[in-house]
Swiss-Prot record:
Species lineage: Bacteria, Pseudomonadati, Pseudomonadota, Gammaproteobacteria, Enterobacterales
Record-linked InterPro entries: Bac_export_3, FliQ
Species in which this protein is naturally found: Pectobacterium carotovorum subsp. carotovorum
Sequence similarity: Belongs to the FliQ/MopD/SpaQ family.
Membrane topology, record value: Multi-pass membrane protein
Protein name, per record: Flagellar biosynthetic protein FliQ
Keywords assigned: Bacterial flagellum, Cell membrane, Membrane, Transmembrane, Transmembrane helix
Positions in coiled-coil regions: none
Transmembrane stretches, start-end: 16-38, 55-74
Role, per record: Role in flagellar biosynthesis.
Subcellular location: Cell membrane; Bacterial flagellum basal body
Keyword set includes Cell membrane: yes
Any Pfam family matching the protein: Bac_export_3
Length: 89
């Protein structure tokens, strides 16, 4: 196994991990920003107020993007297992 192939596998793994983490993280970021703007506009300084909308937003994002995320992960694992003989030998 050459250093280039190790770097390619690592690069692909990082790319897949970023693609899997991005939808829920972006949903939490946007909902937190929106709730913070509403709290600033209404001068409500309750720290726990933003948790429930964030949790619900992440949950619904995972429900909507879940099949795509699962297909992405399965495609990567199929590719990785298909390359396993080349990696070992």
């Amino acid at each position: 196994m050459t250093p280039e192939s190790v770097m390619a596998l690592g690069y692909e793994a990082m790319k897949v991990a970023l693609a899997l983490a991005a939808p829920p993280l972006m949903a939490a970021l946007l909902s937190g920003l929106l709730i913070s703007l509403l709290q600033a506009a209404t001068q409500i300084n309750e720290m726990t107020l933003s948790f429930i909308p964030k949790i619900l937003t992440v949950f619904f994002t995972l429900v909507i993007a879940g099949p795509w995320m699962l297909n992405l992960m399965l495609d990567y694992m199929r590719t990785l297992f298909g390359q396993l003989p080349n990696i070992i030998g």
